[in-house]
Every structure is written in structure tokens, then in C-alpha cells.
From Swiss-Prot:
Residues 63-191, 278-303 are annotated as: Disordered. Signal peptide: none annotated. This is Homeobox protein MOX-2. Mesodermal transcription factor that plays a key role in somitogenesis and somitogenesis and limb muscle differentiation. Required during limb development for normal appendicular muscle formation and for the normal regulation of myogenic genes. May have a regulatory role when quiescent vascular smooth muscle cells reenter the cell cycle. Also acts as a negative regulator of angiogenesis. Activates expression of CDKN1A and CDKN2A in endothelial cells, acting as a regulator of vascular cell proliferation. Residues 157-170, 182-191, 289-303 have a biased composition (Basic and acidic residues). The gene is Meox2. InterPro entries: HD, HD_metazoa, Homeobox_CS, Homeodomain-like_sf, MOX-1/MOX-2. It holds the Pfam family Homeodomain. Residues 63-81 have a biased composition (Basic residues).
Amino acid sequence: MEHPLFGCLRSPHATAQGLHPFSQSSLALHGRSDHMSYPELSTSSSSCIIAGYPNEEGMFASQHHRGHHHHHHHHHHHHQQQQHQALQSNWHLPQMSSPPSAARHSLCLQPDSGGPPELGSSPPVLCSNSSSLGSSTPTGAACAPGDYGRQALSPADVEKRSGSKRKSDSSDSQEGNYKSEVNSKPRKERTAFTKEQIRELEAEFAHHNYLTRLRRYEIAVNLDLTERQVKVWFQNRRMKWKRVKGGQQGAAAREKELVNVKKGTLLPSELSGIGAATLQQTGDSLANEDSRDSDHSSEHAHL
């Protein structure tokens, strides 16, 4: 034997006789509050009535008429209640928990939406406030979001993205640490010598290219400088002197050669080279003369 509740859910044109036992229990909520023996079945039947079927007005009119009839004949309500208990004991209906009722309530409320949702709207959420049904279960357990378009990433992609993020973070941190170290190192300020200090240092350098520790200490005290500053100045001055001396020596040597060529005087090294060349030339000339004499003597012998 099929339960009238499932017939209500299946057939949109349910008759008033099939809804009579449940409508009486639902109307008991409006008449008196002490006859609430089946809250779950009353909520399911009321949810099916709210679903918006064609005989909706007729159902509400019949319920209103039966409500007045129930107030006048209270003993008839007790008789119907006993009959309903007997039917339930014969059918052996299982005890329905609150989550299925919440699911039925959500399914019955679904047709109330006025037309299809727009394309740009958010995905529908199949959730209803089950606190109105009197259930003690949390609403989050009966909620099912309808966002089915998103695709879950595979673990390999997640690991790749996390590894790339870690590498970028580590490189950024290393670059930041390097820049902070470079910026944190104080740059040594260049010592600004006065004209008087430079004059004294140049005079000392003209006499002594290298200083002793005692002389360096004396110059530092006289010029109000540190020994390190005096030492560094003499080191730089010696390097500059070597560069200038190398360039001056090359230029001076070329100038001397030009002057000596103009005057006709030669340097000792050049004289030694020229002497060897002249000796070689004289030897060659003597050899040529000897060969010529031998040729002449041979010619006279033939004559």
C-alpha cells in the first residue's frame, strides 16, 4: 500500500481524500497547540502544498472549511487521530530523520524560482534554512553548493606551483639580503687634504720616497693627520711617480736621440754598434780589393 505522502510528491492532482489525514494534523497547528503529535509529517505535507500546483486555491479552501468543522466536532478529530495511528502501525513506516525532511523541503521550494537563472548570475545553492522545520541538525550538513564548473588541480601541478613560488621567494630573499649587505657596508670617505698639507707632503716626498715609522709619526702629528692617512698618501704618490717616470723616461730617451742625430753626436751604445758596423764594412772592402788584384794578375798571365 502506497503512502499518501509519496502520492502527493508524485501526482500534482492529488485528491482531498488522500490529504485528509495529514491536513487534519496540519490544521491542528492552527486550531490548538497541544495536538502536535506528528510535526515531521505535517511539515512534509505543508511543503507539498506550498509547491505551487494548479489545485492550490481549492486545497486552501477545503482546509479552511475543515478547520471550522474541526472546532465544532472535537471528538471527530480524536477519532481521526486514532485511525491515523492505527494506519501508521500497520504500514510500519520508518522514522524519518531531519535531514530527509530538509531535503524534501528544499526540493519543494525549488519550483518557486521564477524561470531559468541568468547566465551571469552566481551558481545556485541547493540549501534551505532547516531551522524553520524544528530540526536540531546544523544547516551546513544539508547544504550542497552548485559550483560544479571548477576543476580540481592535480597534485603534480600543485607541487610545481608551490616549488616555483618557493624558488622565487628564496631568490628574492637572497637578492634582498645581498642588497642589504651592500648598502649596510659604510663606504670609506675620501680624505680631503688641504693645500698646506699637500705642500708639506710633496716636499717630504721630494726628499724621501719612503718614510720610516718615526718620520711618518712626526708628519702625522705636524699635519694633524693619522699615520694611516700619511701612509696611504705616500703609497698613492709612489704609484703616480712610477707611472710618470716611465712615461718621462721613454719620452726623454726619444728626445735625446733626436737631439744627438741633429748634432751629430752619438751615444756610447750607438758608438759601439756603429764601430762594429764600420769594421765589418772595412773587412768587406779589403776582401773585395784582394779579389780584384787576383783577377788582374790572372789577366796579365794570360796575355
